[in-house]
Amino acid sequence: MSEPAPAKRLYIKTYGCQMNVYDSERMADVLAPLGYGVTDDPAAADLVVLNTCHIREKATEKVYSELGQIKRLKEARRAEGQGMTIAVAGCVAQAEGEEIMRRQPAVDLVVGPQAYHQLPELIARAHRARGERLAADFAPDEKFDALATERRPTGVTAFLTVQEGCDKFCTFCVVPYTRGGEWSRPAEAIEAEARALAAKGVREVTLLGQNVNAYDGANGQGAGLAGLVRRLAKIPGLDRIRYTTSHPRDMDDDLIAAHAEVPELMPYLHLPVQAGSDRILRAMNRAHTAESYLRVIEKVRVARPDIAISGDFIVGFPGEREADFEATLQLVREVGYASCFSFKYSRRPGTPAAALPGQVAEEVKEERLQRLQALLEQQQLAFNAAQAGRVLPVLFEKTGRHPGQLIGRSPYLQAVHAHAPDRLIGQIVPVKVESGGRNSLAGVLELETA
């Protein structure tokens, strides 16, 4: 017997980082008791939520462009005698709440990343056409206390937020102003959520935080992220653990040791450095040097020789000279990355870097980004190609585009394509890699090659 259709339809569009993906999932959880079922069609939605990112100017402007399109859908539904509520959530909502309401009056409510547990009440206020329609409080403990441990089924992998906010105050970054200071969830609450996920068939969790390795939500010895990883590794059925995003200053010896000692912790580390020039790192207020970053990488590789390293880079930071950029390229060559994210510096209002002299011309930023990305893509292709001939344990997640094909993830987070029966979804299966491209691996089940 099929389940009844949901009484109301919810469309969520997510911009930005994995934490926003997690937040969007939890918003759907919060709204499910009100009768909202998720739809992929915004034109059919009774409630549209745009979960926004404020890291770069382009991402912010995308939100306003999207709101113009959603407004037209709202007007079309009104003409048909149907309603639509528009909500803007996330970091743009936190930073520009009043501006959003001014620029786009069709928006019914604005909710910051620490207040989305208030969505049911905000929606009720919007429907009553009275009361405050903007919630942007910094109270992450209240948010998580209000969220149920149980979550909707997510598949065989899931994100799990363990830490929010940032105290580092990099001069280019808006996170301390949109997400607040560093705050860690209690380990008991995280474990309860992880156990509930495992009971629903989740085999892999990625622990999320703006500075996830600053986690300190447990009491006593082993209170940091390493202790949390060891605790979660004991959960039956939870076979893989990852974490992101980390700061070099918080990569302590205990966490590095966990990479050697905890088999469930995958051999993959995303450790942003942003630049290879100490002069630029000082201007960014990163509080580490290129050399200290390289020392951390060396220690991690001693602990786990096969670990895949990922990172973030910003080119064209104010005052960046050619020599500074060359230092970044040299650091990339020394590390040898498996994958990376790289961006042109984006001037964000209210951040110290926005007022710095020496703003770099757009064409210079673009030229440097192309040079950096060419080197990073070369390294990524080399890392993937080096997997050919190896047998890797692959967690199959979903069907592929071709008949009989499944897509999974290697321990190094690469997408792996192989022909396999659907019954293997959710299973960790040995796959012999036949080839590695820039973005994925292709292989065959090891049983077929035996």
UniProtKB/Swiss-Prot annotation:
Span of domain MTTase N-terminal = 8-128
Checking SMART domains in the record gives: Elp3
What does the entry list as the binding residues for [4Fe-4S] cluster 2? 166, 170, 173
* Location within or outside the cell: Cytoplasm
Q: Which reaction does it catalyse?
A: N(6)-dimethylallyladenosine(37) in tRNA + (sulfur carrier)-SH + AH2 + 2 S-adenosyl-L-methionine = 2-methylsulfanyl-N(6)-dimethylallyladenosine(37) in tRNA + (sulfur carrier)-H + 5'-deoxyadenosine + L-methionine + A + S-adenosyl-L-homocysteine + 2 H(+)
Q: How is the cofactor bound?
A: Binds 2 [4Fe-4S] clusters. One cluster is coordinated with 3 cysteines and an exchangeable S-adenosyl-L-methionine.
- The protein's superkingdom reads Bacteria
Please name the InterPro entries in this protein's record: Elp3/MiaA/NifB-like_rSAM, Methylthiotransferase, Methylthiotransferase_CS, Methylthiotransferase_N, Methylthiotransferase_N_sf, MiaB_methiolase, rSAM, rSAM_horseshoe
Q: Which cofactor does it need?
A: [4Fe-4S] cluster
Q: Keywords assigned by UniProt?
A: 4Fe-4S, Cytoplasm, Iron, Iron-sulfur, Metal-binding, S-adenosyl-L-methionine, Transferase, tRNA processing
Q: Which GO terms describe its cellular component?
A: cytosol
Q: Where is the Radical SAM core domain?
A: 152-382
* Domain TRAM: residue ranges: 385-447
What is the recorded function of this protein according to its Swiss-Prot or TrEMBL entry?
Catalyzes the methylthiolation of N6-(dimethylallyl)adenosine (i(6)A), leading to the formation of 2-methylthio-N6-(dimethylallyl)adenosine (ms(2)i(6)A) at position 37 in tRNAs that read codons beginning with uridine.
**Family designation:** Belongs to the methylthiotransferase family. MiaB subfamily.
Protein name per UniProt: tRNA-2-methylthio-N(6)-dimethylallyladenosine synthase
- Organism listed in the record: Phenylobacterium zucineum (strain HLK1)
Identify the taxonomic lineage of the organism of origin: Bacteria, Pseudomonadati, Pseudomonadota, Alphaproteobacteria, Caulobacterales
Q: Which gene encodes it?
A: miaB
